[in-house]
């Protein structure tokens, strides 16, 4: 028995000695690495400090026996760095070198890291082809090589990385055909903006077209269409018969409606010869003081009801004044009083009705409107949490100010991106928001961003000079905004969220100058710097903002691509979690409590 105890003690002591020796070797390896590279930021990698608790960007495993992760994103690394030294960290699982200026060919020596699960080399200056065989990374789950200058073909050996769930090779110079990658667990794929040709292989046709945009590849054919091709004639015949029956039924319904309407007009002309209904919708009131509602009979009221109600000025903007109105039935709404409408009544009403038809959880629902010669009003829900502008900049500098956490900022940016993407899909894919800014973003009932003010800019005179900080450089008239200019404005919004700066007029120039000097960390809001564990996510969001604010419109992604980029920052939460929490098309339910929030149109 005593011999067994002694033997166990010897084994334990032996293992402890081995572990101590491993972490000692890892420390020596990283000191050798940092002494052989060019970097503009000072790393506190000192031999006298604990590698596991004090070294910036270094994370050890649970028992501090070896280095588990290197997070060196945006640390000013530059030039052709010898990464073979890092390959000695045999237990390394995470290697993040994003947003530096590292050049040279793909570091093949990293293939010695058999335990690697995440490799991010995005936003660097790597060039040349990838190795033909990448199968040594059997445990790899995330591979991001986007925004470099890699060329050649995409290795088919990537298909052997069976645990891979995220692959991003976008914005490189890859050419040739897309390999057939049979990876069942692959959830995120981005091959956009390369020089790829041919067709999308069947194994990848489950991904959206945005994953392949910017290449010369044929769009994937939906599997259900391929399945039923041999029954084409039967399908066509069935459709033709269905259409004929539908047309006959529609004609019958129209005939009944026409006869019914004529009878109604006769009765109406007898009873009220001087009155005329504006619309057949039951929510549209008669007379000059009625507000037109798109839905919800419980909200029907007229101008006199508004004048009697208790109102509070929430904000004044270049388009008019916004009021919080408490109605007699305890309902609270937001009424925006619009000034300087530059279009005739018919065009105004047509645009407003288009906006009112939009139903999406990340787009503020337009409830109704009023138009007369002297007064133009629009009615929205009241969001008690307030606008993103208030949450970011309100009470700044005060001790009792509640900090806006990164989680909330990320959710608001993501929700807003989804909202703008949905807006861009309306009116045949031609609708433009035209006035994206932080005072038009609110928290919806699920705590995600919800955008208001859709399409209003096209109805007004051009914005004054002091209010055009979000405007894309190619836009000289805000009434003629485009979807790419919306993307630019969204990029400014991202910068505002990351920097916490309320003055956005020169924000793009300032952010680019700071990043160019390789001081990316200086960009971020001081309130965010306390959250060191999310610095990598903030850097990735910064990259999205920089792509969105490209000076040339054709260089900017569309909003569907932007949504995917933001999802990839935290895929397990955003890409899947949002859809499980929020059902598509659900209406917004205002939550929270924050008085005096500026709703500025």
From Swiss-Prot:
GO terms under cellular component: plasma membrane
Membrane spanning residue stretches: 239-259
GO molecular function: ATP binding; protein kinase activity
Keywords from the UniProt entry: ATP-binding, Leucine-rich repeat, Membrane, Nucleotide-binding, Phosphoprotein, Receptor, Repeat, Signal, Transmembrane, Transmembrane helix
Compartment(s) where it occurs, according to its Swiss-Prot or TrEMBL record: Membrane
Any one Pfam family match given in the protein's UniProt record, by short name: PK_Tyr_Ser-Thr
Record's protein name: Probable inactive receptor kinase At5g53320
